[in-house]
Amino acid sequence: MTKRISAKHKIDRRLKINLWGRPKSPFNKRDYGPGQHGQGRKGKPSDYGIQLQAKQKLKGYYGNINERQFRNIYKKATMLKGDTGENLIGLLERRLDSVVYRARFSTTVFSARQLINHGHVRVNGKKVNIGSYVVKEEDIIEIRDKSKQLAIIDIALASKERETPEYINLDEKNKKVTFVRTPKFDEVPYPVIMEPNLVIEYYSR
């Protein structure tokens, strides 16, 4: 098991939830956190604890984004017009690693980030190797020609675990997608309950 997969499973156990809805999640086998104290007694969580859990779930889902980067995304969301929670989700879904994952070019957000880091992805014909790159509406994201035969991409596309959401237009044959529009929160196909309002409360303390 690679360090990346091990870390992903650890996130599931730490948050006590099958975060990505994967059938092989270790949380399907045990409902307690990692480590020798994972089976300890559970007290009633505080408001702070509930808000923190909501933040950790959202951070974890998008590839365990580090705290500094996630806080910066939140700050950007507060400066945009409209609902801050909707803005936060929109910014997260516009990350290039999120789009590659939603396009089903990868089975996880982590492997999407790897594809990008290794130069396999093009945005409007240009190489972009930063997973946090923010795409715009009508941007075309595609796998570069030399990488279109990669088995990991074909395996991901063949998987029936997920469907491509409506705000991404997939050309599966050419391994290309168009980012049609920024989605609303209720359009995002989360396999678990996400609560961006609690994340906003956490940072507003």
Swiss-Prot record:
Which terms in the Gene Ontology molecular function aspect does this entry carry?
rRNA binding; structural constituent of ribosome
Give the record's GO biological process terms. ribosomal small subunit biogenesis; translation
Q: Recite the UniProt keywords alphabetically.
A: Ribonucleoprotein, Ribosomal protein, RNA-binding, rRNA-binding
For the keyword Ribonucleoprotein, the answer is yes
**A Pfam family of this chain:** Ribosomal_S4
GO CC terms in record? small ribosomal subunit
Origin: domain of life: Bacteria
Q: Where is region (Disordered) located?
A: 21-47
Q: Where is the S4 RNA-binding domain?
A: 94-154
State the oligomer form and interacting partners. Answer: Part of the 30S ribosomal subunit. Contacts protein S5. The interaction surface between S4 and S5 is involved in control of translational fidelity.
Described function? One of the primary rRNA binding proteins, it binds directly to 16S rRNA where it nucleates assembly of the body of the 30S subunit. With S5 and S12 plays an important role in translational accuracy.
User: Its family?
Assistant: Belongs to the universal ribosomal protein uS4 family.
List the protein's name. Answer: Small ribosomal subunit protein uS4
Q: What is the organism lineage in this UniProt record?
A: Bacteria, Pseudomonadati, Pseudomonadota, Alphaproteobacteria, Candidatus Pelagibacterales
- Gene responsible for this protein: rpsD
